[in-house]
Amino acid sequence: VTIQVRHVTDAEIVPKGFDPYDEAVFIFAELWPALNSDSTSTPQPVPPVRRGVFLLPNILTTGCLACGFFAIVSAIHGDFARAGQAIFAAMVFDGLDGRVARWTRTESVFGKEFDSLADMVSFGVAPALVAYQWGVAAIAEYGSGWGRFGWIASFFYAVCAALRLARFNARASTADKRYFEGLPSPSAAGLVAAFVWFSSEWLEPNLAGLALSFGVCAIAGVLMISAIPYQSIKQIDWNARVKFFYFVIVPLSLALVVANPPPMLLLLFTCYVSLAPLMWVWRKLRRSVGA
C-alpha cells in the first residue's frame, strides 16, 4: 500500500477573504449574551393569554347554542317567526366564534368540539323540530300516514346533519379549504328556517305546503351528506379587488333582506343551495359530451 503525503498550503485551508480578527469579533458577539447571563436563572415564562380572551370564542359558541335552544322553545309555543330568527342569529354567532378564535390565537381542541356540538343543536336538531312542529298540528287532519312521513323527514334531516358534522371534523385537516364537501349544516338550517318562517306568514298549512316543508328537509339532508362541492365564504379574499357588480348586488341584497326578511332569505338560500348541484350536473354533462 502506497501512502502519498502532500503538503497543504495555507491558501487551501483558509478561504479567500478570511479575516481572523473579524471572525473572532463575530463569534464573541454571538456568545456574549450567553456568557453575560446568569446560568442559574430560569428563563422567563411567556405571559399567558388572558382568560377573558380565551373564553370569548366559547361565549360566542354558547350564544349559538342558546339561539338553537330558543328556536326549539319558540317552535313549541307556535312562534315560528321567532324560531326562524333565532336560527339565523345562531348562524351569526357560529360565523363569529371561529374568526374570533383565530384573531385572538385562542383556537383549541375543546373549542372545536364545543362548536361542533352547538352546531348539531342549532343547525341539526332545531331546524328539524321547527319544521316538524310547524306541520304536526295540521298534518294530523290528513291522516296518520302523513304524520309518519313528517316525522321521518325531520329525523332524516337531523341524522344527515350529524353525519355532515362528523365528516367535516374527520376530514378537517385534509379537506380543500376553498370548498365544502356537501351542503354546510348552517346553510341547510337557513334554508329550512327561511321556508318555515315564510310559510308561517304567507302560506296556509295545507297538505301541499306541509309536504313541501318536509320535502325541503329531505332534500337539505341529502345535500348535506352528498359530495357536491360548495364554495366556502371563509376563503374569499375581501381585501382583493372585486368587480363593481358586487358593490351593487351585495348592498341591494342586504337592503331587500332588511325590508322583507322571510321571502328574501328564502330566495337567497334557495339560490345558494341549488346553484352548486346545478353546476355539478352541468360539469358532468359537459364531460360526458366531450368524452
Language-model-derived ranges and their functions:
Residues 55-61, 116-123, 181-189, 242-246:
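Select subsegments of transmembrane alpha-helices in polytopic membrane proteins
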Residues 66, 92, 96, 100, ...:
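Active-site His/Glu-centered metal-binding helix of metallohydrolases
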Residues 3, 11-13, 17-45, 177-291:
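C-terminal membrane-associated helical module and adjoining short loops/tails
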Residues 69-72, 89, 93, 127, ...:
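Alpha-helical transmembrane segments of polytopic integral membrane proteins
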Residues 56-61, 103-165, 196:
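Multi-pass membrane catalytic core of lipid/isoprenoid biosynthesis enzymes
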Residues 44, 49-60, 67-80, 143-172, ...:
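"…together with the soluble PPM/PP2C metallo-phosphatase catalytic core" -> "…together
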Residues 2-95, 279:
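Topogenic membrane-insertion module of multi-pass membrane proteins
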Residues 70-85, 127-152, 195-212, 258-263:
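Helix-coil boundary and interhelical linker segments in multi-pass alpha-helical membrane proteins
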